[in-house]
Amino acid sequence: MKYQAKNTALSQATDCIVLGIYENNKFSKSFNEIDQLTQGYLNDLVKSGELTGKLAQTILLRDLQGLSAKRLLIVGCGKKGELTERQYKQIIQAVLKTLKETNTREVISYLTEIELKDRDLYWNIRFAIETIEHTNYQFDHFKSQKAETSVLESFVFNTDCNQAQQAISHANAISSGIKAARDIANMPPNICNPAYLAEQAKNLAENSTALSLKVVDEEEMAKLGMNAYLAVSKGSENRAYMSVLTFNNALDKNAKPIVLVGKGLTFDAGGISLKPAADMDEMKYDMCGAASVFGTMKAIAQLNLPLNVIGVLAGCENLPDGNAYRPGDILTTMNGLTVEVLNTDAEGRLVLCDTLTYVERFEPELVIDVATLTGACVVALGQHNSGLVSTDNNLANALLQAATETTDKAWRLPLSEEYQEQLKSPFADLANIGGRWGGAITAGAFLSNFTKKYRWAHLDIAGTAWLQGANKGATGRPVSLLTQFLINQVK
């Protein structure tokens, strides 16, 4: 899809003009102009009750006298001054549905005239594009009959300000990153294993002059003492690989990097502490943290942000086997702390703790890890907010700001010293689980023991990384949040 922002005349020929109308006869400038061009036809529709402005209600008019456009699509925008982000998304989706049904190829949108609460024109355009791209997404790689794709080729926003051009640039890059994350996450685990994840990182690096890649294999992990990471991998025939993508693009090449770490369990059966069979197929999504880091690295490379960023994809697989690690095992982590394994299904933190130690070598400005870490986070926050844990208030606030800006929502959970009490073990420095209560927090507390040398935040995306049921599939979250956070570091 090609997106443009330019001033257009309502008399211009096109497949379709999209126009918004508020309730209570609140009309935009363009509505009044088209009404004049069509000799009061739109006002007649309002008087007859056919045009109400009700939220996301659409009416499609064809071949109007006085209008060069083949079609005029009018969409209701609710009450003026009360339109929320969620309602705006419903409007864009309603418009897209009609455009698809009518095989429209090119559109000029005057929805740039509608007002959103606490949002500007930049956001109006960017969110429209991201919504269109997200809604149009299809994953039919393995279907013999492919889904019908939209024929829509051109979408023009009626404005030519610099803000609009930046919105298109940001939206295109973020949408590309989200699609990449969704594609990898939706791949079946018999194909998407740790080696596949490393291969995708290689392809990304080869297609960007600013990206380079280092892959750490099991032999190197053993030399480094990454015993917790390796223990998780022991039950699988698929070897672990940690892919380190480096984006060196800051004006000061010696600037400390921002490090993103993504949990990449390409399949998690739970190991010896086997998960229930129901919905176990969804455990291919246990690598969505790595997928989101991959997507974010793709987005910032496309944007060419003047930053130094390192993205680590911690690829691994957790399966039961005669060689698998066991409850009761004691592991010596890379930083020397010992961990008693009480549950092999609490494996993500074991992979992450060694990865978080590994990234110390980069002397990072800050580190953000992203992981589908705990079911407890889903119980606490549901599927709308990612859980945020951090030892740094400024970093946490910056991430929450990015979450608000993008509507890729997050909610901060507490992290006080008391939670460390639940991680005590009579036999080792730490236990890998903290009991029944506050599981999302104690998982974060566990990780905090391996992040003493830098500013750190943890995003638990177990509830937000994928959907279930009829709309089953990866969401691509939190690529938008992470990319916005990085954009904000440039400002």
UniProtKB/Swiss-Prot annotation:
Top-level taxon in the UniProt lineage: Bacteria
Catalytic activity: Release of an N-terminal amino acid, Xaa-|-Yaa-, in which Xaa is preferably Leu, but may be other amino acids including Pro although not Arg or Lys, and Yaa may be Pro. Amino acid amides and methyl esters are also readily hydrolyzed, but rates on arylamides are exceedingly low; Release of an N-terminal amino acid, preferentially leucine, but not glutamic or aspartic acids
Enzyme class, first EC level, given as a word: hydrolase
Active site residues of this protein: K275, R349
Subcellular location per the Swiss-Prot or TrEMBL entry: Cytoplasm
GO terms under cellular component: cytoplasm
GO molecular function annotations of the record: manganese ion binding; metalloaminopeptidase activity
UniProtKB keywords: Aminopeptidase, Cytoplasm, Hydrolase, Manganese, Metal-binding, Protease
Keyword match Cytoplasm: yes
PROSITE patterns (UniProt xref): CYTOSOL_AP
Listed cofactors: Mn(2+)
Any one GO BP annotation for this protein: proteolysis
InterPro entries noted in UniProt: Leucine_aapep/pepB, Macro_dom-like, Peptidase_M17_C, Peptidase_M17_leu_NH2_pept, Peptidase_M17_N
Entry's EC annotation: 3.4.11.1, 3.4.11.10
Chain residues that bind Mn(2+) 2: K263, D268, D286, E347
Positions that bind Mn(2+) 1: D268, D345, E347
UniProt key word Nucleotide-binding: no
Cofactor binding: number and manner: Binds 2 manganese ions per subunit.
Entry function: Presumably involved in the processing and regular turnover of intracellular proteins. Catalyzes the removal of unsubstituted N-terminal amino acids from various peptides.
HAMAP family (UniProt xref): Cytosol_peptidase_M17
The family this protein is said to belong to: Belongs to the peptidase M17 family.
Name of the molecule in the record: Probable cytosol aminopeptidase
Organism for this UniProt entry: Haemophilus influenzae (strain PittGG)
Classification of source organism: Bacteria, Pseudomonadati, Pseudomonadota, Gammaproteobacteria, Pasteurellales
